[in-house]
Structures are given as C-alpha cells and as structure tokens.
A protein has these predicted regions:
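FAD-binding glycine-rich core of flavoenzymes that anchor FAD
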Residues: 109-130
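Intrinsic-disorder-associated, low-complexity terminal segments enriched in Asp/Asn/His/Tyr and depleted
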Residues: 5-12
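ATP-grasp fold ATP-binding core
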Residues: 64-66, 132-133
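Exposed boundary/loop context
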Residues: 7, 73, 127-131
Length: 241
C-alpha cells in the first residue's frame, strides 16, 4: 500500500500541538481511513453546558452524558454540533440529510442505513482518547421495536415525530471531569495517501476554530433549542471504537 509523504511536513499552529503529530498520523493512515486528531485544553473556564451554549449555532446539536450504574455521572461528557449527516426514519421511510439535500429511501430496517453509511469508514484508535470519539449519536423511539419483533399493527401516531434520529459530526468535544481537561477532536477522513496532508490540515483548522469559539465570551440570552439532543450513554449507536 502506498504511504503518505511525511518527509517535509509537520503541522503546528504557533505553540499549539496536535495529537497525533503528522508523522504518526501518516502511520495511522495505513491502518484505516478515519483518524482522530485532537488538541487538549484546560476546562477551568467552561462546563459542558456553557460550552454547549457557545457551540450551538441554531442547527442541530447534542450533549451526551455518560452514566455509571444508572445513578452517578460518568467521567466523560461529549458535545457535538453542526452535523455533516442526519439520518432519520419514520415507519419504513428513511431520510438522509447531507449538504442541505434530502434523500429518501423505503427500507425494511432503518438501522441498516446507518450501518451502510458508516461501513465506508475504518476508524483508528489514538492513544489518549476514550472509546467513543465519534459516530452516530441519536435516539430510537418505541416503535422501532417493530423492525425487530413481529407485533400487532400500531395504533395511529399521536405525535408527529421521527421513530429514530441520528446525527453524524466529524468534530466533537470530550470533557474529562477527572483530569479537568477538554479534548477537541476532529476525525480526519483520508481518502488516499495523497490526501493525508490536506485531511490533517483540515482537521487541525476545525479544532482551532472550535477552540476559538470556546474562548470567546458568550453574550446574550440563550435557551435550549428545540432540535438539541440531550442524551445519556445508553443512546450511543455504532460509536467509533
């Protein structure tokens, strides 16, 4: 397999160090095509909720809290916004939203669409990150059980809501409450060895843009948007890693 050309390039921005560095990134690109790149910053000025306020731009966002034993907050909180892809279903109809375009399909198993979409990615684990560092985050409604079990016909729906709804974003924030640190992660998609440098640059730029928003003062009133997802760890589906 051809390898990335790493002889001339190591990416830093001022004093900002990204993990993995470019040489290690190229090595990882030989094992898979989705490599997480991250920067770590102190969490002394932000909480998951305050960061959510700064990142939410009125589109789709999520705050995913980890729970231990169903009663105690876990170590990590995960935040994401502005998804690249949205997958939602109602009955046998699945809609895939990407770049503002909506594609509809009639299927027997809506979850198979998520698996099919993610099958083109081979994520690579990077030291220093928890098991979850990206993937499809969302919910499954009660009626989704009809795709797994032979049940009587459903009663007419009283709510105009989707049976399932998943967001896929390539960049997320990981709050580590034990170490009081935030890891800003961007999953770089390497389509070919010649794409390594561009993919790494783009990931680093996305990370810096998010950190810039975190460090900017938050002004004005804010309320939870109607399309924000507040989730617990039991609702993770097909997490990378």
């Amino acid at each position: 397999m051809p390898t990335c050309d790493r002889s001339h390039y190591l990416y830093y921005l001022g004093a900002h160090v990204f993990f993995p560095d470019y040489a290690a990134f190229c090595d990882l690109a030989e094992k898979g095509n989705l490599i997480p790149v991250y920067r770590e910053i102190m969490a002394d000025m932000d909480t998951p909720v305050s960061a959510f306020k700064k990142l939410d731009n009125g589109t789709f966002s999520f705050l995913l809290e980890s729970i231990e034993g169903g009663e105690k907050w876990g170590r990590y909180s995960f935040l994401g916004s502005n998804p690249d892809v949205i997958i939602r279903s109602k009955g046998a109809c699945v809609e895939i939203v990407s770049n503002g375009a909506v594609t509809s399909r009639t299927v027997t198993d809506p979850l198979a669409c998520i698996k099919e979409l993610l099958a083109g990615y081979t994520p690579v684990e990077v030291e220093g990150l928890p098991r979850f560092f990206g993937g499809a985050v969302g919910y499954l409604g009660y009626d989704m059980v009809r795709h797994f079990e032979n049940l009587p016909s459903a009663k007419p729906a009283l709510l105009d809501s989707y049976d399932s709804y998943f967001l896929i974003t390539d960049t997320i924030l990981i709050f580590d409450t034990v170490r009081q640190k935030i890891k800003v992660v961007s999953n770089a998609h390497v389509t070919s060895p010649s794409n390594c440098e561009a993919a790494y640059r783009e990931a680093c730029s996305k990370i810096d843009a998010i950190i810039g928003r975190l460090r900017a003062p938050h002004t004005g009133m804010w309320s939870m948007p109607h399309n924000a997802l507040m989730l617990t760890s039991i609702l993770i589906s097909h997490a990378c890693g």
